[in-house]
Amino acid sequence: MTSSETTTDHPRTGKCPIDHSKFARSNEANPDAYINGIKKDQQSSSWWNSLWSRNTDVASEPDVAMLHKKPSTVDTHDHPLANPPPGCPMHKASNENSTGFFSNLFGREKQNSEATPAVQPPATCPMSNSNQKPAGVSEVLTGVDSKQQSYVPEGCPVATPKRGWFNWFGNNDDQKQEAYEVDKSNMMYKNIPQTAVDDQVVGLETTRTTSSIPKVDGKNWEYPSPQQMYNAMWRKGYRDSGENVPIMVQVHNFLNEGAWSEIKAWEREAGENTEPKLLRFEGNANKRTPRALWYMMLGRINPNRWGSGEGPFDRHDWYVQRKDNSIVRYVIDYYEAPDSADGKPVFSLDVRPAVDSFESVALRWKHWRAMRQMQQQ
């Protein structure tokens, strides 16, 4: 999301444009007016439009701030829900002593793999796969009493059976079975268990939330339920009580929706009425993009301007199908930015079309030139 308050080009810097305190106040005044962070009397599209449009008075905002910094002349609208917190199967901590939002949220370390063999979870959610810091997973959660767990659903559009931390489309209720039935058309698992695992302490919701992200079959992708999230984590060897899982789901959904909003902004630049739909997605946290490597190098040279140089905590590739059936691959790097002034976690997404075709290269060049012109004004 390109914020009018952002002063640099790097995706890790800038201020969060969301007034988080306003949501908390409005929700305290009328706690029954929201479901999973969305007003009951508002349509999803209009809510997201107001949330992510510039200079718009926001009626409800997430507790987790997300800063999208994409060099673009197009404002990002309709930012709905989207990555996962510590201990989350979508991101694996490479440093046991790492700190930050995700690590604090899901603080316990993984049990010894010899004592409890980790089972490979499915993969299909836009926020999966990572051998970096643990990442947060969730849509837009806020204003909900932590004792009441506000749960968000499943079916997230990102990850792959090969590399994903969890695929929200598995087809097996046996939690100890590693094999899942895969849909060959999109390489996604068909289903994933909703049953509680052995020794699970906290009861988790099994309801799934429908995203704003369209599929090629005319339906919309669905996000994972808290129980499915926990099951995926359990397969990877995490043994937390599960009380933080609902928040993970919300962060995850929140970031995914933001990523899709950025993609739609790019598609508007590509031409009118491309009618983009998410065909499939991959989690490629272990594959650094040239752009991410460049930012990491700049961060080590000048951390005050470019951040710490740690690099993104996750990377996804989303395959978007247009109405003419052409397919465009988008690359998304997920960064954890410094917390906001009031202590809220802030995330930055660097979303852009991959340089797979001359058209994508031309689009990025056009985008870069427009951004430079705006900076010079």
Swiss-Prot record:
Cysteine pairs bridged by disulfides in the record: none
Pfam families according to UniProt: Cyto_heme_lyase
Compositionally biased spans, kind Basic and acidic residues: 7-22
GO cellular component assignments: mitochondrial inner membrane; mitochondrial intermembrane space; mitochondrion
HRM repeat segments: 114-119, 124-129
Gene Ontology MF term list: holocytochrome-c synthase activity; metal ion binding
EC number(s) on file: 4.4.1.17
Principal subcellular localization: mitochondrion
Family listed: Belongs to the cytochrome c-type heme lyase family.
Function: Lyase that catalyzes the covalent linking of the heme group to the cytochrome C apoprotein to produce the mature functional cytochrome.
Name assigned to this protein: Putative holocytochrome-c synthase
Taxonomic lineage from the root: Eukaryota, Fungi, Dikarya, Ascomycota, Taphrinomycotina
